[in-house]
């Protein structure tokens, strides 16, 4: 009985350590979003014949916030963007931090609801107010996997990036904000 309890305890401890290692290797430490490692693995698994949506998201004015208020302000913005994405998209897909202020969202559940989800995201972003920075703006672009015949999931990501950069151009042109 004592041996069985010991063995059970040892197996459970090893399982928990393995789960923690997997979590750590796939999770961005700052935002708790999935990281680039998880993103690369998941991109390889996406089926181009199924309908899903790729959303490319980028913060506007992060450098300005870092330069004006310090890196704690920049981290606050990055974490806030991640929280807004998680709140809006997590039930329908996955949120990844793939670079400094670059995020990807892959919607696999009910992708036809993407405009509704984007509206929720816009609302979350508009209603956010931080400790160091008062407001946040983001640019994004999205692409349906079924828009045309794509060569790869990466081709879809590049198309979403292009739309996100168009959105970013519009933001800076309309707001008159400094691009730095």
Residue ranges: model-predicted function:
Residues 134-139:
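PAS and PAS-like sensory/regulatory domains
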Residues 73-92:
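Active-site-proximal alpha-helical element of nucleotidyl cyclase-like catalytic domains
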Residues 1-12:
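Membrane-embedded alpha-helical segments, specifically the hydrophobic cores
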Residues 77, 104-121:
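Short helix/loop segment flanking the catalytic signature motif in cyclic-nucleotide metabolism enzymes
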Residues 19-41, 57-71, 79:
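Conserved nucleotide-binding and Mg2+-coordinating catalytic segments in signaling enzymes
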Residues 94-97:
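A short pre-motif secondary-structure segment
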Residues 67, 71, 115-122, 126, ...:
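Catalytic-core segments of nucleotide cyclases and related cyclic-nucleotide turnover enzymes
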